Amino acid sequence: MDKVKIALQYLMPKHLVSRIVGKFAAAEAGFVTTAFIKWFIKQYGINMSEALHSNPEAYKTFNDFFTRELKPGLRPIDQAEDIMVHPVDGAVSQLGPIEDGRIFQAKGHHYSALALLGGQADDAARFEEGDFATIYLAPKDYHRIHMPIKGTLSKMTYVPGELFSVNPLTARNVPGLFARNERVVAIFETDKGPLAMVLVGATIVASIETVWAGTVTPPTGKKVFTWDYPTEGPEALTLEKGAEMGRFKLGSTVVMLFAKDAIDDFADGVKPEAVTRMGQPFAKLED
């Protein structure tokens, strides 16, 4: 059965399906939207008591519901200076060292940091001998993405690609998954060197957004696009630890890359399959 599911993903017109779903998710369809939201809540066991607006009827579109805001104070940010926090609610897929420029995906599967970053060799070189962490956001999760540490935006890259599912089954069976799917790479300058936040698209992910550029995809293209940003002066964008940096409209995965010697060790309990909650300790930074 697993092989059938993977084969269907190769055959499915993934971009077309995702865009059709995206149009529905953005539509103000009244009672149809509300009925679908109620079904989705029940189907995935979503805890609406955490949402700022717990009544499904408060959301005009499915996208509004999916990117729902949490109640204030529900995800307190660990403010210790030597602590990096979880950027999202989700589950750790994999984490560890970047070895020979390669990142571990699942048993028998690796991919290169160079490919993940859209072939940007200068960017990939900055993460040699560093560390990575991959976090999967399930449909039930809160889908806003936050900063693990304070950083100043220096570059954004849009990388075209496939739209395979990014669930654990697919990660185990599709080689180079996260370097094959459409994605948005944001690079920040931090006190511990560069930080890459890679927002990976997936089947029926209607869009990827950032707080500085709005919707980055769609529309999609066939070329890699890059944007450079000033890191000093009045136009520089610095985001504090815990600040929102982006969001998915339907679930996906975040891959983070850290510079060599940025991380001393991952926090207790942070390992593959561990549940993550935004704002809680993720790693201890090097002194």
Swiss-Prot record:
Keywords: Cell membrane, Decarboxylase, Lipid biosynthesis, Lipid metabolism, Lyase, Membrane, Phospholipid biosynthesis, Phospholipid metabolism, Pyruvate, Zymogen. Pathway: Phospholipid metabolism; phosphatidylethanolamine biosynthesis; phosphatidylethanolamine from CDP-diacylglycerol: step 2/2. It comes from the Bacteria. One of its GO terms (cellular component) is plasma membrane. The active site is at residues 89, 146, 252. Its cofactor is pyruvate. The keyword Membrane applies. One of its GO terms (biological process) is phosphatidylethanolamine biosynthetic process. The modification Pyruvic acid (Ser) is found at residue 252. Is synthesized initially as an inactive proenzyme. Formation of the active enzyme involves a self-maturation process in which the active site pyruvoyl group is generated from an internal serine residue via an autocatalytic post-translational modification. Two non-identical subunits are generated from the proenzyme in this reaction, and the pyruvate is formed at the N-terminus of the alpha chain, which is derived from the carboxyl end of the proenzyme. Binds 1 pyruvoyl group covalently per subunit. It is a peripheral membrane protein. The keyword Transmembrane does not apply. It is found in: Cell membrane. Belongs to the phosphatidylserine decarboxylase family. PSD-B subfamily. Prokaryotic type I sub-subfamily. Heterodimer of a large membrane-associated beta subunit and a small pyruvoyl-containing alpha subunit. Catalyzes the formation of phosphatidylethanolamine (PtdEtn) from phosphatidylserine (PtdSer). This is Phosphatidylserine decarboxylase proenzyme. It comes from Shewanella amazonensis (strain ATCC BAA-1098 / SB2B).
